[in-house]
Amino acid sequence: MIVAEMSANHNGKKETAIETVRAAKRAGADAVKLQTYRADTITLRCDKPDFIINEGSIWDGQYFYDLYEQAYTPWEWHEELFHVAKEEGLICFSSPFDKTAVDMLEALDCPVYKIASFEITDIPLIEYAASKLSLIHI
């Protein structure tokens, strides 16, 4: 199975996200994976050093909250992205980063959850996702 990762490659534009799904199909993908989070559910708006991205990255000096706020896929896009993927014959699924994301994805009948590498120690999230869906990829 070939999975195309959407991540933040839409650059904040819904049209780009939709075209990315269609391009994934043209490129031979079988599925497209989103990331489902909001900045306010995965970090704090805080100016302490632990909340600033380290030197040496392209986001050097940026606050995590601000980066996540720019990079996330707006939740109001998810339904349309799932629909476009289905029209294209693709499986659409996501990495939920918290329980509220799982709940939103449940409403879209998301067929699988991919637990992000960064979240593999978040046992409450994994247990919650597993209580909703039997197919989870870690």
Give the location of each predicted region.
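Conserved, mostly hydrophobic/aromatic
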Residues: E5, A24, L105
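Active-site beta-loop-alpha junctions enriched in small/polar residues
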Residues: S7-N9, Y37-A39, F97-K99, F118
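Glycine-rich anion/phosphate-binding loops
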Residues: N11-A23, W75-E76
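Catalytic domains of carbohydrate-active enzymes, especially glycoside hydrolases
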Residues: E19-Q35
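Active-site beta->alpha loop and helix N-cap motifs at the rims of alpha/beta catalytic domains
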Residues: I58-I123
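Conserved small/polar residues in nucleotide/adenosyl-binding loops
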Residues: I136-I138
